[in-house]
């Protein structure tokens, strides 16, 4: 319909709907909480549009009434979506884990403020645990949750990097203040760098109310300027010391732009990430090998070629760039386990086949050793089922497989090697295999996602 011939009220509704459409894009990617400033801003904007819609005069005309009703419903839908994004159980789970990390940082950050850089084991392990738990939060592919998880991980992983660098790498110096007049100044700057490191951790984790990223950037720039002004001509060891301290400052400066990076879509939308796409491409090839092996009745002829192909896939996975994203690291780890499981399946099938071929030689084996191989034969059949299984933990088949594997572990526990070293080694390997199959079954059904 020509806009020029439209009723003024319809025109006005179209204008409002256009503004609402612009707000909709912000609502879709909103990853904060209902207490955030951006939440309040979006809520006010949408409420204002509702008032604007309500004030449109319908003049009692049915078509205008219907248009106004549709516009109001769409705006109310966005208000509800905004509220749901902010109060989603998984979003609250992310926040709860982050608050634990904040409490940990507040407890452990004091040594930095005092100019030291000593990191205790509890701090390191606590941050590692937080990273792991954040990667396990299920987003269901929801953009707002993916973004919230990634933003939180970006901050916590930065803190993890900072404290790991303290724990693993001490500067080869400081030198004694008596070595050169400049050394005293460099040592005092290094002390300030340690304090800045503590401030940076506090800023990243949102536990500092006295500092800002801008102020910290100015402080770090000032420290570099102080170091540049020092006269260290002719003293290689002092020049190297200064260089090391400047490098420490540069490392801290790169973390100040993290929030902006965590906001970019390519970062948190891992479905479009190059490394994830590469992993998925490798997993697709793995499924083809898997399908061929499991569907072919006499697959022994395929074993050699399949193993070579699978080992090639492991090599390709080793080349995948992880960046600093623990979700990509976890995706690669899981893909490696999938490939290794299939290689183990082939190895066991080949070993069982050889035993059948040389049945006369195995007849004289120790009874306990034979018992272990009987269990290994059972495990091979169960492993084939586990590899094919595509259900979840509530499936009867899952519970049946879990029970079968537990029975095999109990059977191995009942085997008495009677001092036979070969039997001891075989039983140990069989137990490890059964545990790995159980772990793989659990991994397949834990509903992990990027």
From Swiss-Prot:
Pfam families, sorted: BAG
Annotated function: Co-chaperone for HSP/HSP70 proteins. It functions as a nucleotide-exchange factor promoting the release of ADP from HSP70, thereby activating HSP70-mediated protein refolding.
Keywords for the protein's UniProt record, in alphabetical order: Chaperone, Repeat
Official protein name in the record: BAG family molecular chaperone regulator 5
Residue span, BAG domain: 9-86, 95-167, 182-260, 275-350, 365-442
SUPFAM superfamilies reported for this sequence: BAG domain
Domain of life of the native organism: Eukaryota
GO molecular function: adenyl-nucleotide exchange factor activity; protein-folding chaperone binding
SMART domains tied to this protein: BAG
Assembly information from the UniProt record: Binds to the ATPase domain of HSP/HSC70 chaperones.
Domain-level remarks: The fifth BAG domain is responsible for the interaction with HSP70 nucleotide-binding domain.
């Amino acid at each position: 319909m020509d806009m020029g011939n439209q009723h003024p009220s319809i025109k006005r509704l179209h204008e409002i709907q256009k503004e609402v459409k612009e707000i909709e894009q912000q609502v879709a990617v909103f990853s904060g909480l209902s207490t955030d400033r951006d939440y309040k801003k979006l809520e006010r904007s949408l409420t204002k549009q509702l008032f604007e819609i309500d004030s449109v005069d319908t003049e009692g005309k049915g078509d205008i009434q219907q248009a106004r009703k549709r516009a109001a419903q769409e705006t109310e839908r966005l208000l509800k979506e905004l509220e749901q994004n902010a109060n989603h159980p998984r979003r609250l789970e992310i926040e709860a884990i982050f608050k634990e990390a904040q409490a940990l940082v507040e407890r452990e950050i004091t040594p930095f403020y005092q100019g030291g850089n000593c990191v205790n084991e509890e701090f390191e392990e606590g941050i590692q645990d937080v990273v792991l738990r954040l990667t396990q939060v299920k987003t269901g592919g929801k953009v707002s949750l993916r973004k919230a998880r990634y933003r939180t991980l970006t901050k916590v992983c930065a803190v993890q990097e900072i404290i790991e660098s303290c724990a693993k790498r001490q500067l080869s110096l400081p030198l004694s203040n008596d070595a050169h007049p400049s050394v005293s100044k460099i040592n005092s700057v290094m002390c300030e760098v340690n304090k800045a490191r503590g401030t940076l951790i506090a800023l990243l984790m949102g536990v500092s109310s006295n500092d800002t990223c801008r102020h910290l950037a100015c402080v770090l720039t000032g420290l570099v300027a102080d170091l540049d002004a020092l006269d260290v001509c002719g003293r290689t060891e002092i020049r190297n010391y200064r260089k090391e301290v400047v490098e420490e400052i540069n490392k801290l400066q790169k973390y100040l732009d993290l929030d902006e990076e965590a906001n970019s879509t390519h970062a948190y939308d891992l479905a479009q990430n190059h490394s994830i796409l590469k992993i998925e491409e490798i997993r697709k090839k793995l499924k083809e090998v898997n399908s061929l092996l499991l569907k072919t009745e006499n697959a022994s002829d395929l074993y050699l070629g399949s193993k070579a192909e699978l080992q090639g896939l492991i090599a390709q996975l080793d080349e995948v760039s992880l960046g600093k994203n623990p979700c990509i690291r976890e995706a690669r780890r899981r893909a490696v386990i999938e490939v290794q499981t299939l290689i183990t399946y082939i190895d066991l099938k080949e070993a069982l086949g050889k035993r059948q071929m040389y049945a006369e030689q195995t007849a004289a084996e120790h009874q306990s050793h034979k018992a272990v191989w009987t269990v290994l034969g059972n495990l091979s059949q169960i492993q084939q089922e586990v590899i094919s299984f595509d259900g979840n933990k509530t499936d009867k088949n899952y519970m049946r497989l879990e029970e079968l594997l537990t029975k095999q572990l109990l059977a191995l526990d009942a085997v008495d090697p009677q001092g036979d070293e070969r039997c001891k080694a075989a039983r140990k390997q069989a137990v490890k295999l059964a545990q790995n199959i159980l772990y793989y079954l659990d991994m397949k059904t834990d509903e992990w996602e990027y």
